[in-house]
From Swiss-Prot:
One Gene Ontology CC term in the entry: cytoplasm
Name of the protein this chain belongs to: Probable phosphoribulokinase
SUPFAM superfamilies attached to this UniProt entry: P-loop containing nucleoside triphosphate hydrolases
Species assigned in the record: Escherichia coli (strain K12)
Record-linked PROSITE patterns: PHOSPHORIBULOKINASE
EC class of the enzyme, as a word: transferase
Reactions performed catalytically: D-ribulose 5-phosphate + ATP = D-ribulose 1,5-bisphosphate + ADP + H(+)
Pfam families xref list: PRK (PF00485)
EC number(s) per entry: 2.7.1.19
Top-rank lineage group of the source organism: Bacteria
Entry binding sites for ATP: G12, S13, S14, G15, A16, G17, T18, T19, T20
Keyword Transport: no
């Protein structure tokens, strides 16, 4: 527990709803008058895009797989050290991975490269991480133990593949074949390093579409929030006022003793209502179980 300098992490693939989650947290920080230092998970990649392409080819020639989900392409040690340092001193460093030309041009760089490391702003009240590995645990590193509030954002897997396919082809210039190859290549790392994190979270938000996603690789568009439900799982029920949440979130219902289901369009509001009191508890120096 980092009582003086709490660490909040949202873990999940980009496009999974992490943007909605980040917006909800920023609203909460503003409402509580908190200054947050933000760290992006992509900044802990080991390789630039050309370097990663070369690493993939070398791994394939050697009969191995490498992906952005696993430790070979990410510096889990540096991520863990970042959380430790911030928890102890409120200090650290960050950089950005530039995915697109729009992101790269202001830095006079090309897509697929990193900005220089820079110190985190000071003073701040909380560290906010958004990325793939906020709750990762390996034999060498335990990132999850340094997180005070861990939130998982994960769609059902077919929806995740649809989001990846459409995002990577329309925004990042990849071919459909390259994206499908990436899905196959990433599966072992996804199973070993991504999915176990969602058993360590305090909360999970899982988007479930109500339209047919049986063949994600033939999808022409991403199901909208209004075409989805969001399944919210609570690890600990202490302080969770289900009757109040049901009254505030029209169309919501309880599907299990520790699970609330809300219409997709209510996802952002649900996050704000649920997480604001949790952030308040953190800032009061209380531990979230």
């Amino acid at each position: 527990m980092s009582a003086k300098h709490p660490v909040i992490a949202v873990t999940g693939s980009s496009g999974a709803g992490t943007t909605t989650t980040s917006l909800a947290f920023r609203k909460i920080f503003a409402q509580l008058n908190l200054h947050a230092a933000e760290v992006e998970g992509d900044s802990f990649h080991r390789y630039t895009r050309p370097e990663m392409d070369m690493a993939i080819r070398k791994a394939r020639d050697a009969g191995r797989h490498i992906s952005y989900f696993g430790p070979e392409a990410n510096d889990f040690g540096l991520l863990e050290q970042t959380f430790i340092e911030y928890g102890q001193s409120g200090k650290g460093k960050s950089r950005k991975y530039l995915h697109t030309y729009d992101e790269a041009v202001p830095w006079n760089q090309v897509p697929g490269t990193f900005t220089p490391w820079q110190p985190l702003p000071e003073p701040t009240d909380v560290l906010f991480y958004e990325g793939l590995h906020g709750g990762v645990v390996t034999p060498q590193h335990n990132v999850a133990q340094h997180v005070d509030l861990l939130v998982g954002v994960v769609p059902i897997v077919n929806l995740e593949w649809i989001q990846k396919l459409i995002r990577d082809t329309s925004e990042r210039g990849h071919s459909r074949e390259a994206v499908m190859d990436s899905v196959v290549r990433s599966m072992e790392d996804y199973i070993n390093y991504i999915t176990p994190q969602f058993s360590r979270t305090h909360l999970n938000f899982q988007r479930v579409p109500t339209v047919d996603t049986s063949n994600p690789f033939a999808a022409k568009g991403i199901p909208s929030l209004d075409e989805s439900f969001v399944v919210i799982h609570f690890r600990n029920l202490e302080g969770i006022d289900f009757p109040w949440l049901l009254a505030m979130l029209q169309g919501s219902f309880i599907s299990h003793i520790n699970t609330l289901v809300v219409p997709g369009g209510k996802m952002g509001l649900a996050m704000e209502l649920i997480m604001l009191p949790l952030v308040q508890r953190l800032m009061e120096g209380k531990k979230i179980e």
